[in-house]
Amino acid sequence: MKADKLIGLIQPKKGNVNSILDLHETGCLGKITSFKDMLDGRYLIDLSGLARFKVTKEIKNNKSYRECEISFEDYQDDLIVKKEKLKFSDLELIFKDLKSLFEKKGYIINWKSLEKQNLNETINALAMASPFSLEEKQILLESQNLEIRKNKIAEILSTYSYDDFNNTTIQ
């Protein structure tokens, strides 16, 4: 952690019965902004997401962590700062539903602080901090751009709002 403070994060796939879990193809490169040693030997880390990547190959090793060869080719736009066509006003309904969901789940969010960030950072932070399932967060991570991610968040929120944000399974 002393070198460049970069780490790649990839979620395991759900429903895996192997002792070594299969990984999703898409992950995110993050920069460690702070970390703390916990008394039980774990680390508590804060990350800033930099760019998404695709796993091209997993490298076998005997380490306590997994290593992969990755490509940023599909997500080159993550590295370019660009003006988004969306405005905060385009997201009023989504923010209203997210606030309801976060309150229902007991999350405390500083909305004023979020609105000071650029729209892309705000949407990404809310998507990853949300009480969505790992599969739902993976769908958001893989969304190609902010407009698609906004629409996916709206779709996910509509399933939660159906049962007043209790997220009970409907069959």
Q: Over which residues does each language-model region extend?
A:
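Small/polar glycine-rich anion-binding or flexible loop at a beta-alpha turn
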Residues: 116-119, 141-146
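Short helix/strand-capping connector loops at secondary-structure junctions
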Residues: 131-141
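Extended, Lys/Glu-rich alpha-helical coiled-coil stalks
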Residues: 105-117
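Core structural elements
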Residues: 114-132
